From Swiss-Prot:
It is found in: Membrane. This is Ig-like V-type domain-containing protein FAM187A. Its main location: membrane. The keyword Membrane applies. It is a single-pass type I membrane protein. InterPro entries: FAM187A/B, Ig-like_dom, Ig-like_dom_sf, Ig-like_fold, Ig_V-set. Belongs to the FAM187 family. Residues 1-18 form the signal peptide. Residues 399-417 are cytoplasmic. Disulfide bonds join C290-C346. Residues 19-377 are extracellular. PANTHER family: FAM187 (PTHR32178), IG-LIKE V-TYPE DOMAIN-CONTAINING PROTEIN FAM187A (PTHR32178:SF7).
């Protein structure tokens, strides 16, 4: 290719890049801000992370400030920014239950909230440090504590729609997740959130459909909350089977080294995924998390070669379960037993990514801590036992006093003493 052709191609490539940059910078110019501030309704499940883009802003504004209000017209407004519009927070460093002030991040004018909680429900405003608002969201974070699970393979149906006159309460499902395993039978699921349809909703809230908003939206009148509080979020599961993609095998040189070290020419056991070792004291609880997994991901667990399907191990399927998977994809083992020893494998989005080798010891010091759920349970049961004994003791003495006052109405206080 000649020098002239090369020059023309480079010039064309540079022009395309310049055009791309101009297009990205002109997004806010092509999106006019509403003359009357309205709220864009959005609903999420608890423990999920979500992003709120600032869809419009004046051209001369170089940094945005995000504000939060619990209710419209509230006198308390929380500022979610460092006033430079560039606050960054890593999702991996966010702990469950921490304050929203340490669970948000601002990237390219968008607000990111990690591990959202029902307390984060409210109104979010995109504006300037002077308090001028450009765009607003009505965010509804629905709790996952009373979530209802159904399994299509067992012919279980989701919750039926509810009608209260002009009010229509129903569930809107998200897309199915990918199959959580490959090469063997797996499971996929989707979650549904509570929505309602009502003709007399506030016009300041943008609806997904005509007169339809999430059940926790600020557009819902207070008198309707009693009808919607029992329509909880849902989880629906079904079986799936997909083939595994080809993955890079262990290099021959590494296998040759293993063969040399074994001395007998037989290769030692080579784990397919990284394995973490942990020893747990007998009788104490343990919670295992899948690395890099979030509640909306497809996560599966195996013990050695035995799959732990949610149809048998999902939290709430059986109240007496000692080993179960919660709605955040964590594996719980309560009151560890010797039979729990083994390797627990974690699948993420259909790929086996990690293993957890669990050993159970019967001796050794184990410092008690209030952060340990088993310790808290033991303390609660002990206090409850003392409370019941105290109530029983007081009840017996009250009965004795009542009986003596009826049988011997002329007894004196000295007689009782």
């Amino acid at each position: 290719m000649s020098l002239a052709h090369t020059t023309v191609l480079l010039w064309a490539w540079g022009s395309l890049q310049a055009f791309e940059i101009v297009e990205k910078e002109s997004v806010f110019q092509r999106t006019p801000c509403p003359a009357f501030l309205v709220f864009d309704n959005a609903a999420y499940l608890a423990d999920m992370s979500f992003e709120l883009p600032c869809h419009c802003k004046p051209e001369d504004v170089s940094a945005v400030v995000w504000y939060y209000q619990k209710h419209l017209g509230s006198k308390r407004t929380t500022v979610l920014t460092d006033f430079d519009g560039r606050l960054l927070t890593e999702a991996a460093h966010v702990r469950v239950g921490s304050s929203m002030l340490v669970r948000f991040s601002i990237r390219m004018f968008s607000l990111l909230v990690f591990r959202a909680q029902p307390e984060d429900t409210g109104l979010y405003f995109c504006g300037t440090r002077e308090g001028d608002y450009f765009y607003a969201y009505d965010v509804d974070i629905q709790s996952n504590k009373e979530i209802v699970a159904s399994f299509k393979d067992m012919a279980q149906e989701p919750l039926p729609d509810e009608y209260y006159g002009a009010l229509h309460v129903f569930t809107t499902f998200w897309e199915w997740t990918p199959c959580d395993r490959c090469g063997v039978r797996g499971e996929q699921w989707r979650f549904g959130l509570c929505y309602l349809q009502y003709p007399d909703l506030s016009p300041r809230y943008i609806k997904t459909r005509s007169a339809v908003v999430s059940c926790g939206s600020g557009a819902v009148p207070w008198k309707l909350h009693l009808q919607t509080k029992y329509h909880t979020p849902e989880l629906q599961f079904q079986s799936c089977l997909v083939s595994c993609q080809k993955r890079n095998k262990t290099r021959k040189g590494v296998l040759a080294i293993y063969s040399y070290v074994s001395k007998l020419g037989s290769r030692p056991w080579v784990p397919q995924v990284p394995i973490q070792f942990h020893q747990q004291r007998l009788g104490h609880g343990l919670i295992i998390s899948c690395p890099g997994a979030r509640p909306e991901h497809a996560v599966a667990w195996d013990k050695d070669n035995q799959p732990l399907y949610r149809a048998q191990y999902l939290k709430g399927v059986n109240r007496s379960m000692r080993v179960f998977i919660d709605h955040g994809n964590h594996l719980h083992i309560r009151f560890t037993q010797l039979s729990d020893r083994g390797i627990y494998y974690c699948w993420l989005q259909g790929l086996k990514i990690a293993g957890f080798r669990l050993g159970v010891i019967t001796r050794g010091r184990y410092p008690a801590s209030l952060s340990d759920p088993e310790t808290r349970t033991a303390i609660e049961l002990t206090l409850m036992g003392y409370l019941l004994i105290t109530i029983f003791f007081i009840t017996i003495h009250l009965c004795r006093c009542c009986c003596q006052s009826r049988c011997c109405p002329n007894f004196s206080a000295q007689t009782l003493l």
